[in-house]
Regions:
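Active-site loop/oxyanion-hole signature of alpha/beta-hydrolase fold enzymes
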Residues: 53, 90, 100-136, 140, ...
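Alpha/beta-hydrolase
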Residues: 200-281
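Conserved loop-alpha-helix segment in the C-terminal half of the alpha/beta-hydrolase fold
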Residues: 267-309
């Protein structure tokens, strides 16, 4: 008798392997560098011209292997997958990820929105292949993957959403143009924030200081991992380290977007769908709980929950998460 997807996922989770705690115990933090177990620099880096905006693209794995696309969340960058992506690549995939515009090493564009990010994603994907491929997204990247799956279902064989599942609540890491209601105080607050950063760059600090700032939003992630992220997601200048994130971006925003729109479209996904949900709520998470999704999963959909894990499932339990994803897309 053929095992169900849920049964097969339970089997691979049982051999989950290393957790963040295991890996962090063996990390080595220097003054300006960090060695983190299993982290791998991308095998290839290139740029995609997305209608005049340069998008930094990163790849792990054999260039001749079938592609698997990986999308990061808001206030993040592709190198946050330096542990997770190589694990997927070891499963026989050419893993392709990229920095969203105004994130990481992609160009800082004067205009940014989820619609612009979607266009950039399509440009990257079509630059790599015209063959249908799996797509995996975390947080905002997961929500973007849902939109791509709804708009271009012929391009994707499987869709995995890592803790970016919609509910009736507003998402915390959307950009400033994507708010539930256009309120005067929100608009005024955004303009005040813009005026307060005339130099157009983020506050500098030491490597430990930047890791500590990130820990305020990601309290479940280890200091060792956050320190590693500084070395791959910040630039080191004469006055210290600065995150390579648009200084105009901040939590929240304003505009017409409503989270229920994504939720209402979820049942219509035609490809096999896997949702991964961490049950420990935290600031960067979406606050979605399993009951929010009851009746909304697509016909070929499966929801897998992780007890004792927060928003960054693939960082807290990278080996287990990679095993579950590889089992699903295979």
């Amino acid at each position: 008798m053929t095992a169900t997807l849920a049964e097969r996922i339970a089997t691979v989770r049982a051999r989950g392997g290393a957790t963040m705690a295991d890996l962090s115990a063996d990390a080595v933090i220097g003054e300006d560098s960090v060695s983190y177990p299993l982290a791998q620099t991308p095998a290839r880096q290139w740029r995609c011209d997305s209608d005049g905006v340069g998008i930094a693209v990163y790849e792990w794995g054999d260039e001749t292997a079938p592609p698997l696309f990986l999308m990061h969340g808001g206030f993040d960058f592709a190198r946050t997958f330096d542990v997770f992506a190589p694990l997927l690549a070891a499963g026989g995939w050419r893993v392709v990820s990229w920095d969203h515009r105004n994130h990481g090493d992609s160009d800082a564009a004067p205009f940014t929105s989820w619609s612009a990010d979607i266009r950039d994603a399509v440009n990257v994907i079509t630059s790599v292949t015209n063959v249908p491929s799996p797509i995996v997204g975390h947080s905002k990247g997961g929500a973007m993957a849902l939109r791509l799956g709804q708009a271009l279902p012929h391009k994707f064989t499987h869709l995995v959403n890592i803790d970016g599942l919609p509910s009736k609540r507003a998402a915390p890491d959307v950009s400033n143009h994507e708010r539930t209601r256009l309120l005067q105080k929100d608009l005024s607050g955004w303009l005040d924030h813009k005026r307060a950063s005339p130099e157009g760059q983020r506050k500098p600090g030491t490597l430990p200081e930047l890791a500590s700032r990130r820990a305020r939003m990601n309290p479940r992630l280890s200091p060792q991992w956050l320190s590693y992220l500084v070395t791959v997601g910040a630039k080191h200048e004469a006055d210290g380290w600065r995150w390579k994130i648009d200084p105009m971006m901040r939590m929240g925003g304003f505009g017409p977007w409503r989270p229920s729109w994504s939720l209402d479209g979820l049942p219509g996904l035609p490809m096999p769908f896997l949702g991964l949900l961490g049950l420990e709520l935290e600031q960067m998470g979406w606050g979605t709980v399993p009951d929010d999704l009851r009746g909304f999963l697509p016909r070929h959909g499966h929801l897998e929950t992780f007890t004792g894990v927060g928003h960054f499932i693939h960082a807290e339990r990278p080996v287990e998460t990679a095993n579950v994803v590889l089992e699903f897309v295979s």
